[in-house]
UniProtKB/Swiss-Prot annotation:
PROSITE patterns (alphabetical): P_GLUCOSE_ISOMERASE_2, P_GLUCOSE_ISOMERASE_3
Family according to the record: Belongs to the GPI family.
NCBIfam families in alphabetical order: PRK14096.1
Keyword hit for Chaperone: no
Catalytic activity: alpha-D-glucose 6-phosphate = beta-D-fructose 6-phosphate
Organism: Synechocystis sp. (strain ATCC 27184 / PCC 6803 / Kazusa)
Keywords: Cytoplasm, Gluconeogenesis, Glycolysis, Isomerase
Active-site feature positions: 324 (proton donor), 353, 457
Pathway(s) it belongs to: Carbohydrate biosynthesis; gluconeogenesis; Carbohydrate degradation; glycolysis; D-glyceraldehyde 3-phosphate and glycerone phosphate from D-glucose: step 2/4
Domain of life according to the entry: Bacteria
Gene that produces this protein: pgi
SUPFAM superfamilies for this protein: SIS domain
GO molecular function: carbohydrate derivative binding; glucose-6-phosphate isomerase activity; monosaccharide binding
Name of the molecule in the record: Glucose-6-phosphate isomerase
Cellular localisation: Cytoplasm
Length: 531
């Protein structure tokens, strides 16, 4: 295409939403009118699937669950009064609780106010709040947020030691988020945090808040120990779509972020993505572009390039939303399909000095998504040269990279928002949630369960049970024992490698296990309990 033809294609496929001042440009994706026509029946079904989902149909058949994250920003859509109350009442409670914390009505025993917030969670209970905090938290928030989002002891120590070093532990509110209350990572982070608080002479319940399912293990703990408050999670909201539930709204509000604006932005985008006309539905346009890029089989990766520091974590947030939703072995008919779209990214223009070299000249196994923010900063900008600011450079880098990629037959999408505010962030969340839903329908997969994650949890649990058996066996041995003999004694003769990795980890952490012999030849090692 020549420049005039490209300009016409840009206008033909441009989507603009006046209320959000939002643009979506898919013109640099090379799909044809014939493909659009061929996909019309699939999109008709996708639109109908969304109608049924929002009315309360069982959209997650593998777990026999409704999927209701769209109701969170418009409770009137919920299928019954009970579910509406499950949305409106927690939101009211969150706003009241946050106001009391900010005003000092709810405060720690030895400080006038809470100054910091420690959020403990994993997956969507961390990635969403982290993205929103990076994007929207004010420079001087009423509560500065910190995260424990892993079972890494050193990572936990770094967070807690930092709070202790600044004498902030005594004024830190701890919010633990876990749907079941039994997920190991938040459970472990909670236990470690509680131990540190108690070691400092701080009664943990005076600092603790839970976000969990009513009746869960975490809910019971919060009730038994008389924590400050527990906010509910709903069965019909998955972790990766929970940012606009208590999971994300509570930490955001505590930081002083306008959560009502986030909800309103999402609601407005939801309305736009209900339109049953492909060209007038931004989420459907995204799904079309994804389908074209990977031939409906995820053959190309999605590279997210936000040209704004505040959106640095958007790619990590989308990584879970897209990959956990769409990465499925089987479709809804039971056929093996191995679906999914790999997602990665960082930020522009940093990435132009990193992997964009490969994007332009290397393996063409991707499509790019540029996130453009029109407003540069609050206040005037310095002219670095006549008529040119640093924001002009950033915009030029985006446009130049888009053009350079296109010249080498690399496809790209451009999403444009006016500024990084609560309304736009809420709209972005809603846009990609709906695009994932549409794409899941196009390729006929259940986008709302995660059997692979559950398989990993079960495997980890079996390894920990094996570790217990190894420790018990070693403690009852009178002397050193060979690795293969140990594996046989714990009834795991086919798992010698796993047994080896368990004892190596125990030995490295002074857990009473010693390894004797040449580490280059693990099969020759002798294992012994050091009493």
């Amino acid at each position: 295409m020549n420049n005039q033809q490209l300009w016409q294609r840009y206008q033909d496929w441009l989507y603009y939403h006046g209320g959000l001042d939002f643009y979506l440009d898919v013109s640099r994706m090379g799909f044809s009118d014939a493909l659009v026509e061929d996909l019309q029946p699939k999109f008709a079904k996708a639109f109908q699937d969304m109608v049924a989902l929002e009315k309360g149909a069982i959209a997650n058949p593998d777990e026999q669950r409704m999927v209701g994250h769209y109701w969170l920003r418009n409770p009137a859509l919920a299928p019954n009064d009970g579910i509406r109350a499950e949305i409106t009442e927690p939101l009211r409670q969150i706003k009241a609780f946050v106001a009391d914390v900010h005003q000092g009505n709810i405060k720690p025993p030895t400080a006038p106010k809470f100054t910091d917030l420690l959020a403990i969670g994993i997956g969507g209970s961390a990635l969403g709040p982290q993205f929103v905090a990076q994007a929207l938290a004010p420079n001087f928030p009423p509560l500065a947020i910190h995260f424990i989002d892993n079972s890494d002891p050193d990572g936990i120590d770094r967070v807690l030691n930092c709070l202790k070093a600044q004498d902030k532990l005594k004024s830190t509110l701890v919010v633990t988020t876990s749907k079941s209350g039994g997920t190991p990572e938040p459970r472990n982070g909670l236990a470690e945090t509680k131990a540190v608080f108690e070691a400092q002479g701080l009664h943990f319940a005076d600092y603790a808040v839970a976000v969990t399912m009513p009746g869960s293990k975490l809910s019971q703990q919060a009730q038994t120990e008389q924590w400050l408050q527990a906010f509910p999670m709903q069965d019909w909201v998955g972790g990766r779509t929970s940012e606009l539930s208590a999971v994300g709204l509570l930490p955001a509000a505590l930081q002083g972020i306008d959560i009502q604006a986030m909800l309103d932005g999402a609601k407005t985008m939801d309305e736009a993505t209900r339109v049953r006309e492909l060209r007038q539905n931004p989420a459907a346009l995204l799904a079309l572009a994804w389908y074209y890029a990977g031939d409906g089989q995820g053959k190309k990766d999605m590279v997210i390039l936000p040209y704004k520091d505040r959106l640095l974590l958007f790619s990590r947030y989308l990584q879970q939303l897209v990959m956990e939703s769409l990465g499925k072995e089987r479709d809804l008919d039971g056929n093996v399909v191995h679906q999914g779209i790999a997602v990665y990214g960082n930020k522009g223009s940093t990435d132009q000095h990193a992997y964009v070299q490969q994007l332009r000249d290397g393996v063409p196994n991707f499509f790019a998504t540029f996130i453009e923010v029109l407003h540069d900063r609050q206040g005037p900008s310095l002219e670095l040269e006549p008529g040119v600011t640093s924001g002009d450079y950033l915009s030029g880098f985006l446009q130049g990279t888009r053009q350079a990629l296109f010249e080498n037959q690399r496809d790209s999408i451009t999403v444009t928002i006016p500024e990084v505010d609560a309304t736009s962030v809420g709209a972005l969340i809603a846009l990609y949630e709906r695009a994932v839903s549409f794409y899941g329908s196009l390729v006929n997969v259940n986008a709302y369960h995660q059997p692979g994650v559950e398989a990993g949890k079960k495997a980890a649990a079996s390894i920990l049970e094996l570790q217990k058996a190894i420790l018990s066996t070693l403690q009852n041995e009178s002397g050193p024992i060979a690795l293969e003999a140990l594996a046989t004694k714990v009834q795991a003769p086919e798992q010698v490698e796993t047994v080896y990795k368990i004892v190596r980890h125990l030995a490295a952490n002074d857990r009473g296990v010693t390894l004797q012999g040449d580490r280059q030849f693990p099969q020759r090692l002798q294992i012994q309990w050091r009493s």
